[in-house]
């Protein structure tokens, strides 16, 4: 049996037992949760074709149960993403607050279009520890073209 086959079998066996290569229990330290597939932009490069919401997005109860399981497993941080997570802002704010209660650091990845002073304050108050906003080019015109936005980046 070749080395490649043996390695593959080892990886499968470790995956099925939930242990890493050194036999230690695997913990999902950082989890990214796409709270919706819906998006307010139509980026040229989007792999998700994020236009409409998932037909069966998690309810608040289902999401908090999943967060409980993450906390039990030792997850340290949960990144809310999408689509655009701020299209479900109230949902994200409640989940962020819940994350704090169970000891998970909440963060968010957003296109930033929906953030203003009020939203930034709400995110801070809910306990969101970090917000990632991708910038696709140092040139505002190219960034806006890639993101398919009408309002220039410099005016936001």
Please describe what each predicted stretch is.
Residues 1-50, 68-71:
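N-terminal pre-core extensions flanking Radical SAM catalytic domains
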Residues 57-80, 88-156:
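Radical SAM/AdoMet-radical enzyme domain recognition
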